[in-house]
Amino acid sequence: MKPLRIWFACVLGVTISTLLGWSNAMFMALFPVFVLVSLNRWNTGLFVQLILGIFWVSVQVSLIIGFLQPYPVLMLIAVGIMLLFKCFAMHHKPIYVFGYVGLLIGSILLNFGSYQAFDLENFIVGIWIATLMTLPICGLAFYCFPDPIEEGPIMSIQGQDKEPKAILEQTALGWLVAMVAFVIFQVANLNDSLSAQASILVILAPMTLVGSLMAAKIRIIGTLAGCMAAMAIQFVLYDMFDNPILYLVSYAIAAGIFCRWLAKDPVWAGIGFSAISALTIPLTTNMVPGQQDAFFAILYRASSILVAVIATSMMIWLGYKLLKSMPWLFSLPRQEKG
């Protein structure tokens, strides 16, 4: 039933946002998918983490940009402190989602908020609506496609409780790469590179060199699969793309394939999530029926993600080597045995 739950929630989110003309339709689809991939049964705590994490980081970013944007040094310090706490939270299972969504959404908001012409408040409200809608959408998915009651775990998330030294090293690695990415997106004119920025943070999530390199491969494979599916939908529908029924049916068919992957092992789940993201974002943000197609947007998305993944992998490797060359930085005082 899990693949059906994920598929139902994903398609329902896109359907609601399409029929009502809401912006940020991609979040309406991806937030429920992100939650349902981690859940085997209903868990209120995970939804609380998601909602609080997004609401809190939105407030943080609004305050940082509103008060500190004219002062780059102070803004850099404030962002560094904020991202450090997000990276640290990701190492603890009870608050992993709170930290991860804070790191991801916070970085996106900081990037877009740096452009004067961008309406940050409207974007934040759209994210809030998508976040709140995740609760009823997932609830309806669990109601329509329940699983038999089992003794298995309620949820499975990536947060890891490790030794203090390992936590410090991996937190430093994640924070270092996140800060470099923040500076790059602040200095360069990359306001149309949402997918590339998200890819940086997605492959950073494991907080380890080996895990991040594996995540990079998964991200590339999933993105190529999703982009090919999005192009196929556009070519098949052609000038009939402005028909909402045909559009939603085509999207549902393509999403169904990737949602089956999401219910498999972690590797397939990673490929599936990257694919569903690559399918959803260009078709919900760049396509304007009768006016603008998404062909070049899909090509740009694939190429920008490829460049971002390669560059991030190099940054993670360099950061790993740099931190390993300074073992004294993470040395903890030894406790004397009584």
Question: What is the meaning of each model-derived region?
Answer:
Residues M1-F98, N111-I253, I257-G338:
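Alpha-helical transmembrane segments and their membrane-interface boundaries
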Residues I105-G106, L110:
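Hydrophobic transmembrane helix module of multi-pass membrane transport proteins
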